[in-house]
Amino acid sequence: MTALPQRTLMVMAGGTGGHVFPGLAVAHLMQAWGWKVVWLGNPAGMEATLVPKHGIPMEYVRFGGLRGKGMKTKLMLPVNLLRACTQSLSVLRRVKPDVVLGMGGYITFPAGLMTALSGRPLVLHEQNSIAGLANKVLAKVAKRVLVAFPNALPHGEWTGNPIREELARAIAPKARYAQRSGPLNVLVVGGSLGAAALNEVVPRAVALLAPNERPRIVHQAGAKHIEALRENYSAAGLQAGADVELVPFIDDMTSAYANADLVICRSGAMTVSEISAVGVAAFFVPFPYAVDDHQTTNAAFLADNGAALVVQQRDLSAETLADWLRSQTRETLAEMAERSRSLAKPDATEQVAQICATVAGSISGASPEGKQ
């Protein structure tokens, strides 16, 4: 019997982890199904360093955004866009992908346009609750439009965000919370850049609580901010120890989420999706300068369903947080966690991969050997 030719997926994604990591989740699954995967990114983006470490070959297109740039960059847009389109077309002719998956980042725009104009099928995935201009345009020429949050794009199919497999396999919240006793376990996530508002307010809020009201804290703040965070806790009369753990990084986020009764954090798209997948109560403080304020609408997806609380940074204070923590019990947080888990899309990675396979003309992609 003649073996079927190996099919090729090209992933277009770059710029931030919110675009790259969900793309990697789909890429690895497609590889497990026997597909060849090629990644199109920007040589100056994080993907240029990260993706090759995952054994995925790279192709490059140079293209950047206009937000915050000077007049010279804006005047050069037509030239830069034309160059990026030419580079994208060259890559498409060389790679000959059976399907192209656009996961976001500036390079997705010229490469997505050239994908559609060259007659190759484009699958578009929007990770945020509010789509950017590029995806709004590309959605008009894509074969399938997928969204992580309902109604992010017209006619978008709600798949959720592709996440790491271990997050989707976390033990159900009801079982986790029922096994615990004693002080609440609170995880504070500032991210690699640190979230100054959280680093300043959380220590003061905990200090306002009576000793018997204080939760156990695991506070992640990024390597550059860990000493300042230590000083913040010290100034609040709290020392790092058994009940206050300060860490620059967390390698195993699945365990960190699963061990927490409550997560206090920003509300980037992947953070919201991961918290929902694991099923844990959340206190969101959206980044106030996010494009189109998309972090607020990301968080609202869970908050509107009783799975989280959203407090804007301008309204956040030690007193507000302390009062809210006093009002919570492990039982109330467990209820929030259950609601959060019920909104998750744990099969998002497989669903996105299956759609790519279908668009490429496969009967079924769900085969580790890639047999159709």
Curated annotation (Swiss-Prot):
One of its GO terms (biological process) is peptidoglycan biosynthetic process. It is an enzyme of class 2 (transferase). One of its GO terms (cellular component) is plasma membrane. GO terms for molecular function: UDP-N-acetyl-D-glucosamine:N-acetylmuramoyl-L-alanyl-D-glutamyl-meso-2,6-diaminopimelyl-D-alanyl-D-alanine-diphosphoundecaprenol 4-beta-N-acetylglucosaminlytransferase activity; undecaprenyldiphospho-muramoylpentapeptide beta-N-acetylglucosaminyltransferase activity. Pathway: Cell wall biogenesis; peptidoglycan biosynthesis. Pfam families: Glyco_tran_28_C, Glyco_transf_28. SUPFAM superfamilies: UDP-Glycosyltransferase/glycogen phosphorylase. It is found in: Cell inner membrane. It is a peripheral membrane protein. It catalyses: di-trans,octa-cis-undecaprenyl diphospho-N-acetyl-alpha-D-muramoyl-L-alanyl-D-glutamyl-meso-2,6-diaminopimeloyl-D-alanyl-D-alanine + UDP-N-acetyl-alpha-D-glucosamine = di-trans,octa-cis-undecaprenyl diphospho-[N-acetyl-alpha-D-glucosaminyl-(1->4)]-N-acetyl-alpha-D-muramoyl-L-alanyl-D-glutamyl-meso-2,6-diaminopimeloyl-D-alanyl-D-alanine + UDP + H(+). Disulfide bonds: none annotated. Its EC number is 2.4.1.227. UDP-N-acetyl-alpha-D-glucosamine binds at residues 16-18, 128, 164, 192, 250, 295. Keywords: Cell cycle, Cell division, Cell inner membrane, Cell membrane, Cell shape, Cell wall biogenesis/degradation, Glycosyltransferase, Membrane, Peptidoglycan synthesis, Transferase. Belongs to the glycosyltransferase 28 family. MurG subfamily. NCBIfam families: murG. Cell wall formation. Catalyzes the transfer of a GlcNAc subunit on undecaprenyl-pyrophosphoryl-MurNAc-pentapeptide (lipid intermediate I) to form undecaprenyl-pyrophosphoryl-MurNAc-(pentapeptide)GlcNAc (lipid intermediate II). PANTHER family: GLYCOSYLTRANSFERASE, UDP-N-ACETYLGLUCOSAMINE--N-ACETYLMURAMYL-(PENTAPEPTIDE) PYROPHOSPHORYL-UNDECAPRENOL N-ACETYLGLUCOSAMINE TRANSFERASE 1. This is UDP-N-acetylglucosamine--N-acetylmuramyl-(pentapeptide) pyrophosphoryl-undecaprenol N-acetylglucosamine transferase. It comes from Paraburkholderia phytofirmans (strain DSM 17436 / LMG 22146 / PsJN).
